[in-house]
Regions:
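Amphipathic, oligomerization/interface secondary-structure segments
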Residues: 1-170
Length: 170
């Protein structure tokens, strides 16, 4: 990706956001950066960002109503951080402890998705080239859903990663 001087601009910006997420201390900031890094692959149309993030993001993590809700929540939390809205409004009625726990969990989930997505395209040159430019990314998402699944392969299991590797109290 970095060998191509003029290519992969969107993915490079997304990867920089991923690295910023790894360096960030606050969970809201980490989550914001990880979701933005995933968004680099999704290339949502203006005015359809949330819709495309949820729909297209399912290619990376699987298709189910639970996954759709997860992606919608991650995008909602990212929007809170991006627009400086109070995350307590997003989690209205929950205790401070529960808000912290859910935000940390969401941050980890977004990190897992971002990590697996960048790792996959960096390990597969055939896949990486499909994300070389905005035009190639647009063409990628115009493919038939079954073809997309065949090209991408097995989605990452976010819930298993959370069960195996996440401790919200650390």
């Amino acid at each position: 990706m970095y060998v191509a001087k003029d290519g992969y601009r969107r993915l490079k910006r997304g990867f920089h956001s991923y690295l910023d997420g790894l360096k960030a201390i606050h969970e809201e900031t980490r989550l914001r950066h990880f979701v933005r890094s995933i968004e680099a692959f999704i290339r949502p149309d203006i005015g359809k960002t949330r819709k495309h993030f949820v729909y297209r993001g399912q290619l990376f993590v699987g298709h189910s109503s639970e996954i759709s809700d997860l992606l919608g929540n991650l995008y909602g939390l990212r929007s809170c951080a991006e627009h400086m809205n109070d995350i307590h409004d997003f989690y209205a009625g929950l205790s401070e402890n529960e808000i912290d726990k859910r935000t940390a969990t969401g941050s980890f989930q977004a990190e897992v998705i971002a990590n697996s997505t960048y790792r996959r395209v960096c390990e597969r040159p055939d896949l990486l080239k499909l994300f070389a430019s905005d035009g190639s990314i647009k063409a990628f998402w115009e493919k038939d859903e079954n073809e997309l699944r065949e090209i991408w392969g097995v989605p990452v299991d976010v819930s298993s990663a959370v069960k195996e590797r996440f401790n919200p109290y650390i």
